[in-house]
């Protein structure tokens, strides 16, 4: 069976706009894994709970570098030894509207806050239960990672702010 790559991308963009997850796999020569990607702008508590339940549960929030700067999110480790150069920032929770921060509802709330165009550093607390990731400028053309794929897909879907969330899919 032959797949039309353009049709697959269009289907993924449609699903992101509808708040549904898409599965993005990388090369077997890289991490050899797949991540669920949801748009923080369109997803629901139910989909966040689903992603937690059917993934590693480790939720990341990819965003463009300028967005991380606006939220005053420094890198977790300034001189990372990660060979893949994943740019983790400090973890966060929403400053308001959450309890412990760990529930799907609380993490969904944190994602909503991170996705709000007018959100500032005062809208999140550190540390927390969501791990923002800083995407490389230029997207997958400059770094073929899930972080950049998530941000690029949200951009192509016309979702603002260009922001997503990832959950590693075990066994991929």
Q: Over which residues does each language-model region extend?
A:
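Catalytic domains of riboflavin
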Residues: 1-172
């Amino acid at each position: 069976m032959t797949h039309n790559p353009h049709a697959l991308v269009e289907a993924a963009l449609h699903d992101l706009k509808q708040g549904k997850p898409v599965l993005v796999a990388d090369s077997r020569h890289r991490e050899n894994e797949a991540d669920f990607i949801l748009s923080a702008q369109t997803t629901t508590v139910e989909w966040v709970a689903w992603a937690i339940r059917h993934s590693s549960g480790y939720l990341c929030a990819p965003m463009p570098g300028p967005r991380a700067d606006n939220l005053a999110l420094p890198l977790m480790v300034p001189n990372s030894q990660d060979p893949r150069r994943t740019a983790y920032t400090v973890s966060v929770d929403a400053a308001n509207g959450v309890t412990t921060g760990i529930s799907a509802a609380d993490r969904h709330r944190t994602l909503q806050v991170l996705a709000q165009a007018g959100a500032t550093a005062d809208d999140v607390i550190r540390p927390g239960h969501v791990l923002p990731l800083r995407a490389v400028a230029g997207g997958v053309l400059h770094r073929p990672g899930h972080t950049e794929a998530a941000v690029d897909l949200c951009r192509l879907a016309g979702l603002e702010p260009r922001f997503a969330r990832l959950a590693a899919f075990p066994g991929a």
